Regions:
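Hydrophobic transmembrane alpha-helices and their immediate loop junctions
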Residues: 1-376
Length: 376
């Protein structure tokens, strides 16, 4: 996601924050002061908001760790004012496994609610009597146990709504898939998600108090739009998956026009890239074996990061990406896509009987999908 920067790395999973999160903290400060909070209360309010997003991070790690159990890698976890998302390389093939990964996130919130509830019960620190009577309650640390109990209950229940893009949508689809098929189950859940998005705006219009409508109504509209289009995107992804599984690498394999040697200079790579015939390249060792790959984003980034005078002194081998998994002509395009994403590459060599017979790159796949999708 553009505009997100890394703030931590936990269990080899980068945790990133979108820049708009900073705007949310500014909003917290302005709204707190506008509603009579002193600076100490505003500070505690900000701490509360950070605590909420800590709960969201733990929720996303629930997905990440459960996905790892099924061999699915998590690229990163991104936080924004709309929530968090664990970007997985894919989902388990079996519906029951997908439902386990989906439920793992809300389960974390259920466990957190149990922890806060248990602590509050043991210490008699849960007090629901003054909630909603004043916004100052959010700036009082004495209410945090109660608030985090309620927040985690809300996060669990909200995410279990049986509609995309919530976790409950994936669980609901996994229950429908065995009898209806994955595509039809996804379509039904997509319609539910879009219906929920519209309903959310309608409810916000009638239920949000007038004094809070100036900032809550736009937030509800933005969240609903996100839900609506993400639900649609989920169905598109399933259609793409079906196409990928029906076609093989042999349909897209091509011979590379240009192949770099690992001691070629960056100036040479940049010159070849400018010709526009290819954007992704193989890099070979002196004995003809594959040393790695070098693609347009990396070439441009390297060329910009060093002075023009240095383009002749730096070699391609300093910046190439290694290829850990290759493909064969009989592999499906779905296998190709998964291997491409898991290695964060844009091109893969194709081998048959240990002999290099060609390449397939991401641009070919995108063009193929675009034509196939339009023909449906």
């Amino acid at each position: 996601m553009k505009g997100a920067f890394q703030i931590a790395k936990i269990a080899d999973i980068p945790v990133k924050l979108h820049w708009s999160f900073v705007l949310m903290l500014v909003w917290v400060t302005i709204e707190g002061r506008r509603n009579g909070m002193n600076w100490e209360s505003v500070g505690w309010f900000a701490v509360l908001m950070l605590g909420v997003f800590a709960c969201v991070v733990l929720h996303e790690f629930g997905h990440a760790f459960s996905a790892k159990r099924y061999g699915v890698r998590t690229k990163d976890i991104i936080l924004s004012p709309l929530g968090g998302v664990a970007r997985l390389d894919g989902l388990p093939e079996k519906p029951i496994d997908e439902s386990v990964v989906a439920f793992a996130g809300p389960l974390v919130n259920i466990l957190l609610a149990a922890i806060f509830g248990g602590y509050g019960w043991l210490t008699s620190s849960i007090d629901l009597s003054n909630l909603g009577t004043s916004r100052l309650v959010f700036g009082n640390p004495e209410n945090f146990v109660t608030l985090f109990l309620l927040i985690n209950i809300f996060l669990a229940l909200f995410n279990l709504i049986p509609a995309f893009p919530m976790d409950g949508g994936r669980i609901f689809r996994s229950l429908l898939s065995p009898s209806l098929g994955r595509r039809r189950a996804t379509l039904i859940t997509t319609y539910l998600g879009q219906g929920m998005a519209v309903l959310l705006v309608v409810l916000a219009y009638f239920l949000v108090p007038p004094r809070m409508s100036f900032y809550l109504i736009p937030l509800f509209i933005l969240s609903s739009a996100f839900m609506f289009f993400m639900a649609r995107q989920e169905y598109r992804m399933v259609k793409f998956e079906e196409i990928l599984k029906k076609h093989s690498i042999s349909e897209l394999i091509r011979q590379p026009v240009n192949v770099f040697k690992k001691n070629d200079h960056i100036a040479h790579a940049l010159e070849i890239l400018k010709r526009g015939l290819e954007k992704d390249f193989l890099v070979k060792n002196e004995d003809g074996t594959i040393a790695g790959v070098f693609s347009q984003p990396e070439i441009v980034e390297v060329a910009k990061s060093i002075s023009t005078d240095s383009h002749e002194s730096h070699e391609v081998k300093e910046f190439i990406s290694l290829v850990k998994e290759t493909i064969s002509p009989s592999d499906s395009l779905h296998v190709f896509y998964k291997k491409l994403m898991s290695q964060e590459l844009r091109i893969l060599p194709v081998f048959e009987n240990e002999n290099l017979i060609g390449v397939v790159d991401i641009q070919q796949l995108n063009d193929f999908l675009r034509v196939e999708y339009e023909m449906k």
